[in-house]
C-alpha cells in the first residue's frame, strides 16, 4: 500500500544542511538512523534511475532546499542559480539587455546553456527558461555536476539541474517580499501562495506566484552612464560612430570626401569637417537598460491518487506567463542609406552614404509576451517483489510573441532621402524630405512613416513518453548485497516554428530575418543501468560498489548514438567514501542549428588592418593586402562590428564528449558533524557545434598572399549585405568595415575544461540554538577552446574575453568561485551571512599600461535576519550590502563591464513576510 510520500532519512539529512555534496551526509548517519532508513521508501536521486534508500552515488550532487533559497534573499530562481559556484561564463538574465529576449539560462562549467540540461521532476520542459520555475513551488534543487547523457539523453554534457517541486504539501503557505536597490530604483517584488491537502488515498497541491522587476537604467550608474575606451593608459569618452547628426562619405570616385572620412556637418557651425570620435560619438547608454524589467505570473499544481493497491495515478501541471522587455539605442542607417546629390540639405552636392542614429524614435524596445505550459500525467506503482515502475506522458509548449518597436523601414527612410523617389510616393510626399545631417530633425510624422513594428511569434513543443522499471535482485544478490538495476524506454518529439513579421517577409525591416523557420524531429531511446556491490563489511572495505549504464538513442535524422557511463564507490572505512565516474556524452543539433534561414547580424570582430603601418606584429603580406584594399597606414574604425550572415545547416551533426570525475567524501570521527567533499572533474568536447570565428576568418584571409586563403571565400563583401562598398576594396563597405562574412553551424570547435569542486559543512549546538557553517566552491584549472581547426587554442581559465557560447560577448571565467555561509538560529529567530567570492580575471588582450588588464578579486556580502512569531516569519536582509560596484572593462560595448559575470545593480535591501497554516 502507498502512504503519503515522505523523503528518506538520507535526503532529509542532506537538505537540512543545504548545499553540500549529498553523499557527504551518508557517512555521518548513526546506526540507529541507518536502521530507521530500512523502513523508508526508496527514492530516485538526480543522476540515476535506480531507486535507493539513501542518496549515495558515484556522481557528485549538490542539493539545495527551500530554506537555502529563502536565505539567499532572491526574488527569482535565476539569481540563485547564477550564484552557484559551478556556474561560470555567460548566462542570460536580468543583467543582459542585449540579446537575452527576456529569458534566463544556466551555464554549468561555462560550457553553455545548450549543454546544461534543466529538468522539472526529472523531465524536460520545452523552453528551458528559468523564469518559468516559480520559487514558491520549489521543494529542492538537485545539481548534478557530471555528464549524464546516459541517464537523460542529449544536452546533459556539463551536468543537470533538476528542480523538484512540492507534491506532498499540507496546509497554506503565503509569502510576500519587496526589494529596493540602494540607489532607490530597481524595485522587485514577489507574492506567492501554496495550498495543499492530503488523505490516505492521495494528495493535491496548487501554487500561485507573481513576481515583478522594475527597470534600472545604464545612465543611473556611474560605471555605465557613458561608454569609455582607453588611450595611452587613460579613459576617454566614446560611443558609436553612427551619431544623431550623421557620419558620411561620398560615393563619387575621386571626390575629396570619398576618402579620409567619415565626415560630419558640424552641429554648431554648419561647416563640413572630419568626424572626431571624442566629441561626435553617440552615447548609447542613455537609452539602454542596465537591469531589464519583467512581470511573471505562474500557476502550478500536482496531484496523486491511489487507484488500487500499489498503483497510483499522478498529474502535474504548470503555466507561466512572462511580460518582459529590453531597451537599446535607436536604430541607425547602417544599411547604407544614400542621400542623393539633389537633396536640399546635402552639404556637398554629391551622393553620400550616411550612418545616422534615429534618436527621435526613442530607441529600440523589445517586448516579449512569453507563455510556458507543461502537463504530465502517468501511473506509478510497485510489483509484489518490490520492484517499482512508472509510465508517464509529458507535454510541454512555449509561445514567445514578441513586439519590437522602433525598427526602421529601410524602404521608407530611403524615400525620405531621395527627392525624386519621394515625389512619386504619396506617403513620403505627405511627410516630406528628412534632413539627416541635423540632430532632432525627424518630425513625429516622419518617425511614424519610417518606423515599422516587428512582431514575430516563436513556438516550441516537446512531447515525451517514458516508461521505467527499477528494482534489485533481492535474496539472489551477491554476498556483498543485492544488485540494483533500472531500465526504461523513451519516445520524444520536438518541434519548433518561427513566423516572422509580415514586414520582415518582404524585407522592409532592417536587420530582421525575413524567412520562417520550421522543423521537427523525433527519437527513440532505451537505457539500462546497474549497481553491483562487490565488497561489504570487510576490514579493508566497508563498501565497494561498481555501477554502469548504457543508452541507445535513435534520431530520425542522425545515426544511432550509444553512450556509456561507469562509476566506482569505495569506502575503506565508514567515514571515507572515494568515488569516480567516466561518461560519454552527446548533444544533438537544435532545430535552429539545422533549419534557420540566413539573416544579417552585427558581430564584433578584430580588424587586422587597424594602424597596420605601425603594427610591429603585422606581416609584410598583411600590410600589402591592407594597402591593396585602399586603406591608409593609420586606418582606424569608430567601432569594430561586421555585418555578417548567419543561418542553419541541415548537415550539422551531434557533438560528442567525455567526462571524468574523481573525488572523496570524508566525515572525520574526531570532528563531530563535519563533512568535507572534493571532486576533480574534466570534460572534453569534440566536434562542438559552432560557427566560424569572424575574427579568425578575416585574419586568415588577410594573412594569405593576394587573398589566396580559402577563408576569403567566406567573406561575401558589401554585395552580400546590400550596402555600398569602399572604393578599391572587395571585402569592405563604404565605412571600411569587413562585411558579408558567412557562417553556418558546423562541428568545428573543441572544448576542454577541468577543475575541482569542494564542499564542506559543519554544525554545532550552541546555547539555545545551532551554529551552521557551509562552504562550497569550484576551482577552475583549465578552460581551453578552439573555434576551428587551425585557429589558436584559447585558455580562458582565470581570464576574461569573448565567450564562445554567449553570442560573442565578453565574460569572466574566474578560477575560484566560492560561497561561504554562516548561520545561527533558535526557535524564535535566526541570522545568516553569505560571502560570495570570485577571483580576479586577466584581460585576454592585456597590454602594457592598460587600465583594465585585470579586474581584481570580488567579495559580495549578503546578510539576513528572521523572527518567528506563531505562524508568521518576518525577514529583513540585504544582498551586496556594501554596494560593491562591478569592474571596469575597456572597449566593451555593453555597460563598460562584464555584466553577465558581476553584480551590476549594487546593494539591494529587502523585507519579507511569510505565513504557514
Each predicted region: which residue ranges?
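N-terminal periplasmic accessory domains that precede
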Residues: 77-83, 104-107, 155-176, 191
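N-terminal Sec signal peptide and the immediately downstream disordered periplasmic leader
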Residues: 1-74, 79-84, 192, 196, ...
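C-terminal beta-signal and adjacent terminal beta-strands/loops
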Residues: 411, 686, 781-784, 835-844, ...
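C-terminal beta-signal and terminal closure region of outer-membrane beta-barrel proteins
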Residues: 403-405, 409-411, 583, 600-601, ...
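Short loop/turn motifs that connect adjacent beta-strands in outer-membrane beta-barrel proteins
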Residues: 37, 168-171, 184, 200-201, ...
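Surface-exposed, low-complexity loop segments enriched in small/polar and acidic residues
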Residues: 214-216, 220-231, 259-294, 300, ...
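Extracytoplasmic beta-strand/coil segments of soluble accessory domains associated
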Residues: 78-121
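Short acidic/polar hinge/loop motifs at secondary-structure boundaries
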Residues: 123-147
